[in-house]
Every structure is written in C-alpha cells, then in structure tokens.
Amino acid sequence: MVLPGTDGAELVEALKPSRSIRLQPDVLLQGKAQRIGDDEVILYKPRWGAFYGTPLEALLRERGIDALVFCGCNFPNCPRASIYEASERDFQIAVAADAVSGIYPQGIRELERIGVTVQETAEIVSWLTSIPHQ
C-alpha cells in the first residue's frame, strides 16, 4: 500500500524521462492517462488486467498500434490477465517468455492455443529490428 502523492508512490527515478516528473494521482485515480513523454504515458491499473477500467485500448488504437509484446512479473496474475484481455480485443500478441516471471509450460501451451506467439526476448528483438519503420 502506498499513499497517493507521497514519495513511496512515485516511479523509480531511472524510469522517468525527467527527474521533475511526479505522478498526478488526481488524474490517474480518475482512470485517465498521464502523459510523461511523446511516447510515454502512465496509467493506474485497478485490477489484474491492464485493459480493465483503463484507457489503454483507446490510447493504443489512436496511435495505430495493433500488436503488443508482453513481459512482466508473476505470469499467473497480471501478465496472463492482460494477455487475455488483449486477445479479446484482437491485438496481435507476442510474449517474451524469458522476461515473464512464473511462466510455466501449460500456461505457454494455453497462450499458443489462443494465437499468442511465445518466444525468447532475443528472437522478438531480432524480429522487431528487421521490420522497416515508417
């Protein structure tokens, strides 16, 4: 538990594009996005899945993003919920298996059955760097 507006609720400095950025709990707790850079936003995630009760899908769609790569902490909870939510919304999905803690063989098989590509980070990075960018 953290108290909004306190140092304990802040992002780690190394993750911020600028040291002067502070979280805006009044914005985030209303379910809105806080923009902290040209391509960076912060969202408050009220449940396990990243799409539930957040503007994530709208933010991705307005940028023309239709494919997502997932990594994360504790696969059985937040990553899995977010992956299934993304699948329900027809995003193309890849999971970096070596960058997800708690992932297990049956979970990988279940993801593959719903069309998720499961690869190692190096394979995903290699593929992404081979795509011509607009």
What are these regions (language model features)?
Residues G102-V116:
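Active-site-proximal loop->helix
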Residues T117-Q134:
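A charged, well-structured terminal subsegment
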Residues A67-P76, Q92-P105:
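A short glycine-rich beta-strand->turn/loop micro-motif centered on a GG-aromatic cluster
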Residues M1-R63:
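Active-site alpha/beta core segments
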Residues D66, E88, Q92, T117:
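Residue-level detector of anion-binding/catalytic polar loops
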